[in-house]
Protein backbone atom coordinates (compact mmCIF):
# COMPACT_ATOMS: atom_id res chain seq x y z
CA UNK A 1 0.00 0.00 0.00
CA UNK A 2 1.28 3.45 -0.91
CA UNK A 3 2.00 5.48 2.23
CA UNK A 4 1.43 8.77 0.41
CA UNK A 5 -2.14 7.77 -0.49
CA UNK A 6 -3.19 7.46 3.16
CA UNK A 7 -4.82 10.54 4.69
CA UNK A 8 -3.17 10.09 8.06
CA UNK A 9 -4.72 13.18 9.63
CA UNK A 10 -8.24 11.86 9.20
CA UNK A 11 -7.34 8.34 10.34
CA UNK A 12 -5.60 9.79 13.41
CA UNK A 13 -8.68 11.89 14.20
CA UNK A 14 -10.94 8.81 14.14
CA UNK A 15 -8.49 6.80 16.26
CA UNK A 16 -8.19 9.65 18.77
CA UNK A 17 -11.97 10.01 19.03
CA UNK A 18 -12.46 6.31 19.76
CA UNK A 19 -9.45 6.30 22.11
CA UNK A 20 -11.26 8.78 24.36
CA UNK A 21 -13.26 5.75 25.46
CA UNK A 22 -9.97 4.38 26.77
CA UNK A 23 -9.44 7.52 28.86
CA UNK A 24 -12.82 6.91 30.49
CA UNK A 25 -11.89 3.27 30.99
CA UNK A 26 -8.65 4.32 32.70
CA UNK A 27 -10.21 7.01 34.87
CA UNK A 28 -13.12 4.85 36.00
CA UNK A 29 -10.78 1.98 36.84
CA UNK A 30 -8.10 3.97 38.68
CA UNK A 31 -10.19 6.54 40.57
CA UNK A 32 -11.34 3.85 42.99
CA UNK A 33 -7.89 3.61 44.62
CA UNK A 34 -8.17 7.09 46.15
CA UNK A 35 -11.72 6.68 47.47
CA UNK A 36 -11.58 3.34 49.30
CA UNK A 37 -10.67 4.69 52.76
CA UNK A 38 -13.17 7.57 52.56
CA UNK A 39 -16.09 5.43 51.37
CA UNK A 40 -15.27 2.80 54.00
CA UNK A 41 -15.40 5.46 56.71
CA UNK A 42 -18.47 7.23 55.28
CA UNK A 43 -20.65 4.11 55.17
CA UNK A 44 -18.92 2.10 57.97
CA UNK A 45 -18.14 -0.74 55.57
CA UNK A 46 -17.11 -4.19 56.65
CA UNK A 47 -14.14 -5.89 54.98
CA UNK A 48 -16.57 -7.83 52.79
CA UNK A 49 -18.41 -4.65 51.76
CA UNK A 50 -15.12 -2.92 51.01
CA UNK A 51 -14.17 -5.76 48.68
CA UNK A 52 -17.58 -5.50 47.04
CA UNK A 53 -17.09 -1.76 46.51
CA UNK A 54 -13.78 -2.43 44.75
CA UNK A 55 -15.12 -5.37 42.76
CA UNK A 56 -18.60 -4.23 41.75
CA UNK A 57 -17.38 -2.24 38.72
CA UNK A 58 -15.43 -5.30 37.60
CA UNK A 59 -18.65 -7.34 37.73
CA UNK A 60 -20.22 -4.69 35.51
CA UNK A 61 -17.24 -4.90 33.16
CA UNK A 62 -17.68 -8.66 32.83
CA UNK A 63 -21.36 -8.12 31.99
CA UNK A 64 -20.47 -5.44 29.43
CA UNK A 65 -17.81 -7.57 27.77
CA UNK A 66 -20.19 -10.54 27.59
CA UNK A 67 -22.47 -8.79 25.10
CA UNK A 68 -20.17 -6.12 23.61
CA UNK A 69 -19.06 -8.25 20.66
CA UNK A 70 -22.52 -9.40 19.72
CA UNK A 71 -23.85 -5.86 20.19
CA UNK A 72 -21.18 -4.26 18.01
CA UNK A 73 -21.52 -6.96 15.34
CA UNK A 74 -25.28 -6.48 15.33
CA UNK A 75 -25.82 -2.71 15.50
CA UNK A 76 -22.35 -1.42 14.62
CA UNK A 77 -19.24 -0.17 16.38
CA UNK A 78 -20.39 3.45 16.63
CA UNK A 79 -23.78 2.84 18.33
CA UNK A 80 -22.06 0.51 20.81
CA UNK A 81 -19.63 3.30 21.74
CA UNK A 82 -22.59 5.68 22.13
CA UNK A 83 -24.06 3.27 24.66
CA UNK A 84 -20.82 3.17 26.64
CA UNK A 85 -20.66 6.99 26.72
CA UNK A 86 -24.19 7.14 28.14
CA UNK A 87 -23.37 4.52 30.77
CA UNK A 88 -20.22 6.41 31.85
CA UNK A 89 -22.19 9.65 32.19
CA UNK A 90 -25.01 8.09 34.22
CA UNK A 91 -22.48 6.35 36.46
CA UNK A 92 -20.42 9.47 37.16
CA UNK A 93 -23.40 11.67 37.98
CA UNK A 94 -25.03 8.93 40.03
CA UNK A 95 -21.90 8.32 42.11
CA UNK A 96 -21.62 12.04 42.89
CA UNK A 97 -25.17 12.32 44.25
CA UNK A 98 -25.85 8.79 45.54
CA UNK A 99 -27.77 8.75 48.84
CA UNK A 100 -26.74 5.26 50.00
CA UNK A 101 -23.97 2.69 49.62
CA UNK A 102 -26.31 0.34 47.76
CA UNK A 103 -26.95 2.97 45.10
CA UNK A 104 -23.23 3.73 44.92
CA UNK A 105 -22.59 0.07 44.09
CA UNK A 106 -25.32 0.13 41.42
CA UNK A 107 -23.89 3.24 39.77
CA UNK A 108 -20.37 1.78 39.88
CA UNK A 109 -21.68 -1.36 38.17
CA UNK A 110 -23.32 0.78 35.47
CA UNK A 111 -19.95 2.41 34.81
CA UNK A 112 -18.38 -1.04 34.78
CA UNK A 113 -20.71 -2.13 31.99
CA UNK A 114 -19.54 0.93 30.06
CA UNK A 115 -15.92 -0.12 30.62
CA UNK A 116 -16.67 -3.63 29.38
CA UNK A 117 -18.32 -2.39 26.19
CA UNK A 118 -15.75 0.26 25.31
CA UNK A 119 -12.79 -2.02 26.13
CA UNK A 120 -13.88 -4.28 23.26
CA UNK A 121 -15.43 -1.89 20.76
CA UNK A 122 -13.01 1.08 20.82
CA UNK A 123 -9.79 -0.84 19.93
CA UNK A 124 -11.79 -2.89 17.42
CA UNK A 125 -13.02 0.30 15.74
CA UNK A 126 -9.52 1.81 15.68
CA UNK A 127 -8.09 -1.38 14.18
CA UNK A 128 -10.73 -1.40 11.45
CA UNK A 129 -10.28 2.24 10.42
CA UNK A 130 -6.47 2.00 10.41
CA UNK A 131 -4.12 0.81 7.67
CA UNK A 132 -1.55 -1.90 8.27
CA UNK A 133 1.53 0.38 8.28
CA UNK A 134 0.18 2.43 11.19
CA UNK A 135 -2.31 0.09 12.87
CA UNK A 136 -0.09 -0.71 15.87
CA UNK A 137 0.48 2.95 16.66
CA UNK A 138 -3.18 3.83 16.11
CA UNK A 139 -4.51 1.08 18.37
CA UNK A 140 -1.82 2.00 20.91
CA UNK A 141 -3.53 5.38 21.12
CA UNK A 142 -6.23 3.51 23.00
CA UNK A 143 -3.73 2.18 25.55
CA UNK A 144 -2.18 5.65 25.81
CA UNK A 145 -5.63 7.06 26.54
CA UNK A 146 -6.11 4.46 29.27
CA UNK A 147 -2.84 5.52 30.92
CA UNK A 148 -3.82 9.19 30.60
CA UNK A 149 -7.07 8.22 32.33
CA UNK A 150 -5.08 6.52 35.10
CA UNK A 151 -2.90 9.59 35.54
CA UNK A 152 -5.92 11.93 35.46
CA UNK A 153 -7.62 9.89 38.19
CA UNK A 154 -4.49 9.88 40.37
CA UNK A 155 -4.07 13.64 39.92
CA UNK A 156 -7.75 14.37 40.58
CA UNK A 157 -7.64 12.25 43.74
CA UNK A 158 -4.45 13.96 44.93
CA UNK A 159 -5.60 17.51 44.10
CA UNK A 160 -9.19 17.20 45.35
CA UNK A 161 -7.94 15.77 48.63
CA UNK A 162 -5.80 18.89 48.99
CA UNK A 163 -8.75 21.14 48.10
CA UNK A 164 -10.96 19.43 50.67
CA UNK A 165 -8.40 20.12 53.39
CA UNK A 166 -7.90 23.81 52.62
CA UNK A 167 -11.07 25.20 51.00
CA UNK A 168 -14.75 25.70 51.65
CA UNK A 169 -17.64 26.58 49.31
CA UNK A 170 -20.71 28.76 49.79
CA UNK A 171 -22.81 26.26 47.85
CA UNK A 172 -23.89 23.42 50.13
CA UNK A 173 -23.85 21.00 47.20
CA UNK A 174 -20.28 21.93 46.24
CA UNK A 175 -19.27 21.78 49.91
CA UNK A 176 -20.65 18.26 50.14
CA UNK A 177 -19.11 16.95 46.89
CA UNK A 178 -15.69 18.62 47.01
CA UNK A 179 -15.00 19.04 50.74
CA UNK A 180 -17.13 17.12 53.23
CA UNK A 181 -17.40 13.94 51.13
CA UNK A 182 -14.69 14.54 48.54
CA UNK A 183 -14.91 10.99 47.19
CA UNK A 184 -18.09 12.15 45.45
CA UNK A 185 -16.13 14.75 43.54
CA UNK A 186 -13.43 12.24 42.62
CA UNK A 187 -16.00 9.89 41.09
CA UNK A 188 -18.18 12.67 39.66
CA UNK A 189 -15.41 14.42 37.71
CA UNK A 190 -15.69 11.65 35.12
CA UNK A 191 -18.84 13.38 33.86
CA UNK A 192 -16.76 15.91 31.89
CA UNK A 193 -14.84 13.50 29.59
CA UNK A 194 -17.91 11.23 29.34
CA UNK A 195 -20.04 14.02 27.87
CA UNK A 196 -17.20 15.07 25.56
CA UNK A 197 -16.89 11.48 24.29
CA UNK A 198 -20.64 11.33 23.67
CA UNK A 199 -20.60 14.55 21.62
CA UNK A 200 -17.48 13.58 19.65
CA UNK A 201 -19.09 10.32 18.49
CA UNK A 202 -21.57 12.32 16.40
CA UNK A 203 -18.66 13.39 14.19
CA UNK A 204 -17.12 10.02 13.28
CA UNK A 205 -18.39 7.46 10.73
CA UNK A 206 -19.21 3.80 11.19
CA UNK A 207 -16.41 1.26 10.64
CA UNK A 208 -16.12 0.70 6.87
CA UNK A 209 -15.10 -2.93 7.38
CA UNK A 210 -18.24 -3.55 9.45
CA UNK A 211 -20.30 -1.96 6.67
CA UNK A 212 -18.78 -4.28 4.06
CA UNK A 213 -19.54 -7.28 6.26
CA UNK A 214 -23.14 -6.02 6.44
CA UNK A 215 -23.36 -5.76 2.62
CA UNK A 216 -23.22 -1.97 2.66
CA UNK A 217 -20.23 -1.66 0.35
CA UNK A 218 -21.37 1.60 -1.25
CA UNK A 219 -21.53 3.31 2.13
CA UNK A 220 -18.17 1.80 3.10
CA UNK A 221 -16.60 3.03 -0.13
CA UNK A 222 -17.86 6.55 0.54
CA UNK A 223 -16.20 6.52 3.97
CA UNK A 224 -12.95 4.94 2.73
CA UNK A 225 -12.58 7.70 0.13
CA UNK A 226 -11.84 9.99 3.09
CA UNK A 227 -9.00 7.64 4.11
CA UNK A 228 -7.17 7.42 0.77
CA UNK A 229 -6.32 9.86 -2.00
CA UNK A 230 -6.29 7.07 -4.61
CA UNK A 231 -9.44 5.19 -5.63
CA UNK A 232 -7.52 1.94 -6.19
CA UNK A 233 -6.65 1.78 -2.50
CA UNK A 234 -10.33 2.08 -1.57
CA UNK A 235 -11.25 -0.68 -3.99
CA UNK A 236 -8.42 -2.88 -2.66
CA UNK A 237 -9.69 -2.69 0.94
CA UNK A 238 -13.29 -3.44 -0.06
CA UNK A 239 -12.14 -6.27 -2.32
CA UNK A 240 -9.98 -7.82 0.42
CA UNK A 241 -12.84 -7.87 2.92
CA UNK A 242 -15.32 -9.22 0.37
CA UNK A 243 -12.87 -11.90 -0.73
CA UNK A 244 -12.44 -13.18 2.82
CA UNK A 245 -16.18 -13.09 3.40
CA UNK A 246 -16.89 -15.12 0.27
CA UNK A 247 -15.84 -18.37 1.94
CA UNK A 248 -17.40 -17.58 5.31
CA UNK A 249 -20.85 -18.13 6.71
CA UNK A 250 -22.86 -16.01 9.10
CA UNK A 251 -21.13 -15.34 12.42
CA UNK A 252 -22.01 -18.02 14.96
CA UNK A 253 -20.37 -20.33 17.46
CA UNK A 254 -19.68 -22.97 14.81
CA UNK A 255 -17.48 -20.55 12.89
CA UNK A 256 -15.39 -19.98 16.00
CA UNK A 257 -14.65 -23.71 16.01
CA UNK A 258 -13.14 -23.66 12.52
CA UNK A 259 -9.54 -24.99 12.37
CA UNK A 260 -7.11 -22.18 13.05
CA UNK A 261 -9.79 -19.73 14.21
CA UNK A 262 -10.40 -21.80 17.35
CA UNK A 263 -6.65 -21.73 18.01
CA UNK A 264 -6.68 -17.93 17.72
CA UNK A 265 -9.58 -17.71 20.16
CA UNK A 266 -7.84 -19.95 22.72
CA UNK A 267 -4.55 -18.06 22.37
CA UNK A 268 -6.38 -14.75 22.80
CA UNK A 269 -8.06 -15.99 25.96
CA UNK A 270 -4.73 -17.20 27.37
CA UNK A 271 -2.83 -13.95 26.84
CA UNK A 272 -5.80 -11.94 28.12
CA UNK A 273 -6.20 -13.81 31.40
CA UNK A 274 -2.50 -14.53 32.06
CA UNK A 275 -1.66 -10.87 31.66
CA UNK A 276 -3.82 -10.05 34.67
CA UNK A 277 -1.84 -12.43 36.90
CA UNK A 278 1.48 -10.68 36.26
CA UNK A 279 0.91 -7.97 38.87
CA UNK A 280 -0.36 -5.01 36.89
CA UNK A 281 -3.80 -4.83 38.52
CA UNK A 282 -2.40 -5.35 41.99
CA UNK A 283 -0.37 -2.19 41.33
CA UNK A 284 -3.42 -0.39 39.94
CA UNK A 285 -5.92 -1.18 42.71
CA UNK A 286 -3.69 -1.59 45.74
CA UNK A 287 -0.68 0.58 44.90
CA UNK A 288 -1.31 3.11 47.70
CA UNK A 289 -1.72 0.30 50.26
CA UNK A 290 1.48 -1.41 49.07
CA UNK A 291 3.39 1.89 49.23
CA UNK A 292 2.03 2.54 52.72
CA UNK A 293 3.07 -0.93 53.94
CA UNK A 294 6.53 -0.37 52.44
CA UNK A 295 6.94 2.78 54.55
CA UNK A 296 6.17 5.58 52.07
CA UNK A 297 4.80 8.68 53.80
CA UNK A 298 2.72 9.93 50.83
CA UNK A 299 1.30 6.89 48.99
CA UNK A 300 -1.09 8.91 46.80
CA UNK A 301 1.82 10.97 45.46
CA UNK A 302 3.70 7.73 44.71
CA UNK A 303 0.66 6.60 42.74
CA UNK A 304 0.87 9.83 40.73
CA UNK A 305 4.49 8.90 39.90
CA UNK A 306 3.24 5.50 38.74
CA UNK A 307 0.74 7.25 36.48
CA UNK A 308 3.39 9.56 35.00
CA UNK A 309 5.81 6.70 34.22
CA UNK A 310 2.96 4.65 32.77
CA UNK A 311 1.80 7.49 30.52
CA UNK A 312 5.24 8.57 29.26
CA UNK A 313 6.30 4.98 28.57
CA UNK A 314 3.11 4.29 26.62
CA UNK A 315 3.96 7.23 24.35
CA UNK A 316 7.37 5.64 23.75
CA UNK A 317 5.78 2.24 23.06
CA UNK A 318 3.33 3.82 20.63
CA UNK A 319 6.18 5.34 18.63
CA UNK A 320 8.10 2.07 18.23
CA UNK A 321 5.50 -0.73 18.21
CA UNK A 322 5.25 -0.86 14.40
CA UNK A 323 9.03 -0.57 13.96
CA UNK A 324 10.26 -2.94 16.66
CA UNK A 325 7.31 -5.33 16.43
CA UNK A 326 4.87 -6.70 18.98
CA UNK A 327 6.84 -9.80 20.00
CA UNK A 328 10.19 -8.09 20.68
CA UNK A 329 8.48 -5.59 22.96
CA UNK A 330 6.95 -8.50 24.86
CA UNK A 331 10.25 -10.38 25.17
CA UNK A 332 12.24 -7.40 26.45
CA UNK A 333 9.47 -5.89 28.57
CA UNK A 334 8.33 -9.06 30.33
CA UNK A 335 11.97 -9.97 31.09
CA UNK A 336 12.27 -6.61 32.84
CA UNK A 337 9.00 -7.24 34.68
CA UNK A 338 10.34 -10.53 36.04
CA UNK A 339 13.53 -8.83 37.27
CA UNK A 340 11.69 -5.95 38.94
CA UNK A 341 9.07 -8.24 40.57
CA UNK A 342 11.85 -10.37 42.06
CA UNK A 343 13.64 -7.26 43.35
CA UNK A 344 10.42 -5.99 44.97
CA UNK A 345 10.00 -9.41 46.59
CA UNK A 346 13.64 -9.21 47.76
CA UNK A 347 12.92 -5.84 49.39
CA UNK A 348 9.92 -7.10 51.36
CA UNK A 349 11.77 -10.28 52.38
CA UNK A 350 15.03 -8.69 53.54
CA UNK A 351 14.34 -4.99 54.22
CA UNK A 352 14.57 -5.36 58.01
CA UNK A 353 17.65 -7.57 57.96
CA UNK A 354 19.53 -5.41 55.45
CA UNK A 355 17.96 -2.06 56.37
CA UNK A 356 17.06 -1.38 52.73
CA UNK A 357 15.82 2.05 51.72
CA UNK A 358 12.18 2.37 50.72
CA UNK A 359 13.44 4.09 47.57
CA UNK A 360 15.02 0.78 46.53
CA UNK A 361 11.50 -0.66 46.36
CA UNK A 362 10.07 2.45 44.70
CA UNK A 363 12.73 2.45 41.97
CA UNK A 364 12.00 -1.17 41.01
CA UNK A 365 8.27 -0.53 41.33
CA UNK A 366 8.55 2.25 38.76
CA UNK A 367 10.83 0.10 36.59
CA UNK A 368 8.15 -2.60 36.69
CA UNK A 369 5.56 -0.06 35.52
CA UNK A 370 7.92 1.01 32.71
CA UNK A 371 8.45 -2.58 31.53
CA UNK A 372 4.76 -3.38 31.76
CA UNK A 373 3.71 -0.24 29.88
CA UNK A 374 6.16 -0.82 27.03
CA UNK A 375 5.19 -4.47 26.60
CA UNK A 376 1.99 -6.22 27.65
CA UNK A 377 -0.06 -3.07 28.25
CA UNK A 378 0.90 -1.60 24.88
CA UNK A 379 0.58 -4.83 22.92
CA UNK A 380 -2.43 -6.72 24.30
CA UNK A 381 -5.19 -4.55 22.83
CA UNK A 382 -3.33 -4.30 19.52
CA UNK A 383 -3.10 -8.09 19.24
CA UNK A 384 -6.68 -8.75 20.35
CA UNK A 385 -8.04 -6.19 17.89
CA UNK A 386 -6.15 -7.57 14.88
CA UNK A 387 -5.84 -11.35 15.33
CA UNK A 388 -9.42 -12.38 14.47
CA UNK A 389 -11.30 -12.54 11.12
CA UNK A 390 -13.60 -9.63 10.20
CA UNK A 391 -16.79 -11.70 10.48
CA UNK A 392 -16.10 -12.98 14.02
CA UNK A 393 -13.93 -10.18 15.40
CA UNK A 394 -16.61 -8.80 17.70
CA UNK A 395 -17.57 -12.17 19.17
CA UNK A 396 -13.97 -13.39 19.51
CA UNK A 397 -12.85 -10.15 21.16
CA UNK A 398 -15.75 -10.43 23.59
CA UNK A 399 -14.59 -13.91 24.58
CA UNK A 400 -11.01 -12.69 25.12
CA UNK A 401 -12.25 -9.58 26.89
CA UNK A 402 -14.51 -11.68 29.11
CA UNK A 403 -11.47 -13.75 30.11
CA UNK A 404 -9.46 -10.58 30.73
CA UNK A 405 -12.07 -9.13 33.07
CA UNK A 406 -12.56 -12.44 34.89
CA UNK A 407 -8.81 -12.39 35.51
CA UNK A 408 -8.96 -8.76 36.61
CA UNK A 409 -11.78 -9.48 39.05
CA UNK A 410 -9.99 -12.52 40.50
CA UNK A 411 -6.75 -10.59 40.98
CA UNK A 412 -8.65 -7.69 42.54
CA UNK A 413 -10.31 -10.00 45.04
CA UNK A 414 -7.33 -12.27 45.70
CA UNK A 415 -4.57 -9.67 46.09
CA UNK A 416 -5.46 -8.64 49.69
CA UNK A 417 -5.57 -12.33 50.66
CA UNK A 418 -2.28 -13.03 48.85
CA UNK A 419 -0.52 -10.09 50.50
CA UNK A 420 -1.61 -11.46 53.89
CA UNK A 421 -1.28 -15.22 53.35
CA UNK A 422 1.68 -15.35 50.96
CA UNK A 423 3.25 -12.17 52.37
CA UNK A 424 4.16 -9.32 49.98
CA UNK A 425 7.38 -11.13 49.02
CA UNK A 426 5.55 -14.34 48.12
CA UNK A 427 2.90 -12.40 46.20
CA UNK A 428 5.43 -10.69 43.95
CA UNK A 429 7.31 -13.95 43.38
CA UNK A 430 4.01 -15.48 42.24
CA UNK A 431 3.50 -12.61 39.79
CA UNK A 432 7.03 -13.15 38.43
CA UNK A 433 6.40 -16.86 37.87
CA UNK A 434 3.18 -16.11 35.96
CA UNK A 435 5.20 -14.13 33.41
CA UNK A 436 6.81 -17.34 32.10
CA UNK A 437 3.78 -19.06 30.47
CA UNK A 438 2.85 -15.70 28.91
CA UNK A 439 6.28 -15.51 27.24
CA UNK A 440 5.99 -19.12 26.02
CA UNK A 441 2.59 -18.58 24.38
CA UNK A 442 3.82 -15.41 22.70
CA UNK A 443 6.87 -17.24 21.32
CA UNK A 444 5.12 -20.46 20.29
CA UNK A 445 1.75 -19.45 18.91
CA UNK A 446 1.52 -15.78 17.94
CA UNK A 447 2.92 -14.42 14.66
CA UNK A 448 4.63 -11.06 14.32
CA UNK A 449 1.71 -9.00 13.02
CA UNK A 450 3.50 -5.68 12.47
CA UNK A 451 3.05 -4.65 8.83
CA UNK A 452 0.44 -7.33 8.06
CA UNK A 453 -3.06 -6.37 6.94
CA UNK A 454 -6.01 -7.70 8.92
CA UNK A 455 -6.83 -9.97 6.01
CA UNK A 456 -3.26 -11.36 5.92
CA UNK A 457 -3.43 -12.10 9.65
CA UNK A 458 -6.73 -13.87 9.09
CA UNK A 459 -5.17 -16.07 6.42
CA UNK A 460 -2.34 -16.99 8.83
CA UNK A 461 -4.81 -18.36 11.37
CA UNK A 462 -7.04 -20.15 8.86
CA UNK A 463 -4.00 -21.97 7.46
CA UNK A 464 -2.83 -23.00 10.93
CA UNK A 465 -4.11 -26.42 12.02
Where are these regions (language model features)?
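Short, well-structured alpha-helical segments
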Residues: 231-245
Amino acid sequence: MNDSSVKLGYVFYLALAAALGGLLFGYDTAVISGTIDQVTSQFSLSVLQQGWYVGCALIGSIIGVAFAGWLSDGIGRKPAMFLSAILFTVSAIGCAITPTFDWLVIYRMVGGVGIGVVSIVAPMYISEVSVSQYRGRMVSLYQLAITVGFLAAYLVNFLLLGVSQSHSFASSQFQLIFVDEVWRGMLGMETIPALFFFILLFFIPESPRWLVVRNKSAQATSILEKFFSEKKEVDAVVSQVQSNLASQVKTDWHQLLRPGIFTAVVVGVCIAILGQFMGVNAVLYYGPSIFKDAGMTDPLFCQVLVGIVNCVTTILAMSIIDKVGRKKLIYYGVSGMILSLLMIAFYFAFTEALNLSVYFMLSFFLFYVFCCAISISAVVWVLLSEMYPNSVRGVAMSIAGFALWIGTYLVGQLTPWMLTSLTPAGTFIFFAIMCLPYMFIMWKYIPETAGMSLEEIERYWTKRK
